[in-house]
């Protein structure tokens, strides 16, 4: 997560997670990265996006449809969304590591102090 690896007050989330707590923290200061999948849950993803558009200033949307998931048969492409999102998140956090000069394995506490 970007909280762990980059010490950023931000997280990737999908609508199932968002509406079980994080949306109560939505404001103009927190960054959210919404992962929009396909399939039955997309309706909830769209609701989350509508909420973010209304109440947040800082958010990014990673939409599987915009990334070409429709090249995979519609009956199964929702099962490939997590793999697509993972690959995207690896590229994104690697880019952040370089831009922010903050190595992904740098930790304050994990493996450093006893807890």
Question: Each predicted region: which residue ranges?
Answer:
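A SIS-like phosphosugar-recognition module
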Residues: 1-115
């Amino acid at each position: 997560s970007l909280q762990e690896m980059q010490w950023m007050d931000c997280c990737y989330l999908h609508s199932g997670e968002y509406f079980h707590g994080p949306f109560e923290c939505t404001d103009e200061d927190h960054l959210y990265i919404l992962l929009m999948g396909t399939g039955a849950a997309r309706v909830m993803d769209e609701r989350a996006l509508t909420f973010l558009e209304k109440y947040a200033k800082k958010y990014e949307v990673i939409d599987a449809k915009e990334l070409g998931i429709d090249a995979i048969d519609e009956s199964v492409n929702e099962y490939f969304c997590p793999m697509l999102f993972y690959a995207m998140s690896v590229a994104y956090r690697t880019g952040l590591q370089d831009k922010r000069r903050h190595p992904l394995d740098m930790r304050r506490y994990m493996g450093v102090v006893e807890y």
